[in-house]
């Protein structure tokens, strides 16, 4: 279902999709809080009961959880799914992949290179190079000067009493408009190539290029009401290429850039002290796109704590990195 009132257009996801993300995000909260057995069970439930596409990041996190409780055969299964579906293990995480059982260790060593080769065989280097070139083109408008101007203007957009006629604001807003125009050109090029190559995802391009593409789409502020991007983003969301968190960030960025209130408060950073009574409303909206609920320390809204979550910790946020 499409939502397009006065604010930014977005679409709501299916019950099946929402149930999966509710369960898997609960697992990841538990994992972050060291409730490992409960997290392991939640991961299993999430994967077994969902028929849709799953981002390999979830399989990798489930791998780490399984390894910590010595469920090594299950960890091996999750790791194979993660890598074959495009996951790249960061160098700072390779030391976490340890199989103590001789059988699982042998199987891991015999297969890791095969899984990696399978993953790499599906990569489109031409698409990767094109995304890298787009990032290079946008460097002029990615300097601290432009970033500072955007941050300053966004803070002003959030404050209804902010004076938008001061020389400082006017000069910074000119930079914002210049950046928006440049970002629009970059986004248009990315969208044109997406029709040819497919949406940038971990099966097609590596993690770095996926992140670059997401940044380009997030910065496409000329698409003020998300009317040009929503069909593409919603399809990518359902295919597991982008997370509910990223989808919400796009919607909220468009709202804020237009002086409107966020729909989902994603990210919550900066709104902790002001969301108050709107927390329940925001969480109900978040559920419609499969996004985990916000849990704030000393929240004024009466929210039922999520099992396994220590209220107010960093484990309550930043559950997605894709």
Feature roles, as predicted:
Residues 247-322:
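A cross-kingdom marker for long, charged
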Residues 72, 223-227, 231, 235-241, ...:
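Extended, non-globular or repeat-rich regions with surface exposure
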Residues 1-6:
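Hydrophobic h-region of N-terminal signal peptides that target proteins for export
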Residues 199-200, 242, 295:
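Intrinsically disordered or highly flexible coil/loop and linker segments, enriched in small
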Residues 82, 99-102, 194, 236, ...:
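Hydrophobic alpha-helix position signal
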Residues 191, 230, 234, 283-286:
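Non-transmembrane alpha-helical segments in soluble domains
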Residues 8-56, 62, 67-213, 220-224, ...:
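Preference for long, solvent-exposed alpha-helical segments and helix-linker "stalks"
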Residues 205-210, 226-265:
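Extended alpha-helical interaction scaffolds used for oligomerization/partner binding
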């Amino acid at each position: 279902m499409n939502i397009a009132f006065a604010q930014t257009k977005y679409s709501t996801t299916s019950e099946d999709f929402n149930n999966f993300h509710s369960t898997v995000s609960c697992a990841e909260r538990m994992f972050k809080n060291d409730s490992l057995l409960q997290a392991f069970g939640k991961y299993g439930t999430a994967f077994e009961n969902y028929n849709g596409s799953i981002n390999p990041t979830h399989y990798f996190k489930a791998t780490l959880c399984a390894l910590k409780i010595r469920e090594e055969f299950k960890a091996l299964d999750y790791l194979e799914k993660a890598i074959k579906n495009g996951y790249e293990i960061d160098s700072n995480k390779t030391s976490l992949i340890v199989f103590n059982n001789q059988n699982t260790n042998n199987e891991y060593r015999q297969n890791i290179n095969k899984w990696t080769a399978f993953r790499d065989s599906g990569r489109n280097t031409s698409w990767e190079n094109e995304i890298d070139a787009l990032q290079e083109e946008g460097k002029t408008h990615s300097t601290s000067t432009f970033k500072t101007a955007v941050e300053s203007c966004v803070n002003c957009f959030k404050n209804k009493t902010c004076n938008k006629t001061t020389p400082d604001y006017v000069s910074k807003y000119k930079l914002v408009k210049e950046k928006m125009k440049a970002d629009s050109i970059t986004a248009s090029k990315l969208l044109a190539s997406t029709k040819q190559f497919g949406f940038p995802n971990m099966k097609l391009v590596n993690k770095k290029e996926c992140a670059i593409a997401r940044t380009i789409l997030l910065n496409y502020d000329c698409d003020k009401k998300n009317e040009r991007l929503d069909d593409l983003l919603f399809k990518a969301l359902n295919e597991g290429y982008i997370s509910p968190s990223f989808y919400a960030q796009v919607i909220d960025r468009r709202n804020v850039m237009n002086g409107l209130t966020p729909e989902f408060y994603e990210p919550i950073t900066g709104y902790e002290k002001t969301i108050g009574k709107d927390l329940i409303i925001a969480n109900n909206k978040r559920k419609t796109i499969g996004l985990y609920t916000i849990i704030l320390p000393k929240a004024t809204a009466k929210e039922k704590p999520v099992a396994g979550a220590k209220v107010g910790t960093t484990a309550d946020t930043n559950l997605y990195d894709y």
